[in-house]
Amino acid sequence: MSKLNKTILADFEAAQIQRKLPEFNQGDTVVVNVKVKEGNRERVQAYEGVVIGTKNAGLNSAFTVRKISHGFGVERVFQTHSAIIDSVEVKRRGKVRAGKLYYLRGLEGKAARIKEDLAAAAQAKAARQAAAKAE
């Protein structure tokens, strides 16, 4: 691919990436609000779970969220810049050392818990308080 084509492609991708989502990593518990179309009406459905993997590839970036629903593990892959994602909220920061948390698939109950990163939680709380004072 020529240099000109690469720059054109990069400019196109930059234009398509419109909104910023909060920063999250593997091990974080997130709530993804997804737009669901049923018939002629549209509603927002919350999907809460643990981020077990991310793929950073520009416009094709994606992340996988795993939750336990009625005793069964359910995973869903979301395209980061998709129009069906209404918003993403980080509930808690997890402290993990692995890049992909696929080992959680084989664990259940208390064994599948992830330690909370208290330093990151305190830092986020301080940032929220500073933003509140600024307003």
UniProtKB/Swiss-Prot annotation:
Cysteine pairings via disulfide bonds: none
One Gene Ontology biological process: translation
Keyword Kinase listed: no
A Pfam family matched in the record: Ribosomal_L19
GO MF: structural constituent of ribosome
Cellular compartments per GO CC: cytosolic large ribosomal subunit
Keyword check for Ribosomal protein: yes
Domain of life where this protein originates: Bacteria
PROSITE patterns on file: RIBOSOMAL_L19
Record key words, sorted: Ribonucleoprotein, Ribosomal protein
Free-text function comment from the UniProt entry: This protein is located at the 30S-50S ribosomal subunit interface and may play a role in the structure and function of the aminoacyl-tRNA binding site.
Listed NCBIfam families: rplS_bact (TIGR01024)
Similarity comment: Belongs to the bacterial ribosomal protein bL19 family.
The name this protein goes by in its record: Large ribosomal subunit protein bL19
Organism: Xanthomonas oryzae pv. oryzae (strain KACC10331 / KXO85)
